[in-house]
Regions:
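Metal-dependent de-N-acetylase/amidase catalytic core
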Residues: 1-8, 91-234
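Active-site rim/loop-helix segments in enzyme catalytic domains that contact anionic ligands
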Residues: 1-108
Length: 234
């Protein structure tokens, strides 16, 4: 996955890619690959608590701030960012949104797609995003699609680590050494000021997964790592 030429990361909310996949994004772009980040929502309702402490806050202003934060974080990592702005808590994905996602996947033709786990009892938006991404990926590459539409080579599908992996059925199959690019992940996390409380937590997770990566690989130089679960068979 480190050497993928084209990577697509799809999150339910604007900041999801930063906590869960900033490292692999930076690794891919460092090696000359291209990464696109898509957020289905800005997380304006359920994931912008710090911003709502302002009694004069508005939904549109929260969206603006989250867009600026996510765009800045993506730029730090060498990626592009776009948001479908579907609205969160609850996220609703209709046929039009699914078509939009399918067309984007067809246009980007990614080698690898990373998204949420299929289960998350603590966040109803994440499983919906995961299901939509998997369905759109199949529609973009499936032989059953009408011949009037172009299709692409199927992408490898991975799931990034949720905040509570034990409750989401997350079993890591792939560890990525992000030690060399961890300063970039730190900068990207710092750009997401609306969720600053997650910075230290995600740093500790990267150290925790590095310990697993060292044991599995035998490499003693891994200081920070990200964990992923492969869906598509090899």
């Amino acid at each position: 996955m480190n050497q993928s030429r084209t990577l697509l990361v799809v999150g339910a909310h604007a900041a999801d890619f930063v906590w869960r996949a900033a490292g692999i994004i930076a690794v891919v772009t460092k090696h000359g690959g291209r990464t696109s980040v898509v957020a289905l929502t800005y997380g304006e309702r359920g994931e912008s608590g710090e911003l709502w402490k302002d009694p004069n806050q508005t939904v549109e202003n929260v969206k603006r701030i989250r867009h600026e934060e996510a765009t800045r974080a993506a730029e730090i990592l060498g990626a592009t960012f776009q948001c479908f702005d579907l609205g969160d808590y609850p996220l609703q994905i209709d046929a039009q949104a699914l078509d939009l996602l399918t067309m984007l996947i067809r246009e980007l033709a990614p080698d690898v797609i990373i998204t949420h786990t299929e289960r998350d009892p603590f966040n109803p938006d994440h499983p919906l995003a995961s299901a939509a991404v998997q369905r759109a990926s199949i529609l973009a590459s499936g032989s059953g699609v009408a011949s009037g539409f172009s299709t692409i080579k199927p992408a490898e599908l991975f799931l990034f680590e949720p905040h509570q992996p034990e409750h989401c059925g997350f079993v890591p199959t792939t560890f990525v050494d992000i030690s060399a690019v961890f300063p970039l992940k730190q900068q990207a996390m710092e750009a997401m000021a609306a969720q600053s409380y997650l910075h230290q937590y995600q740093t500790e997770i990267a150290k925790y997964r590095a310990n697993h990566a060292r044991r599995i690989s035998g490499r003693t130089d891994i200081q920070y790592a990200e964990a992923f679960q492969r869906v598509t068979p090899t």
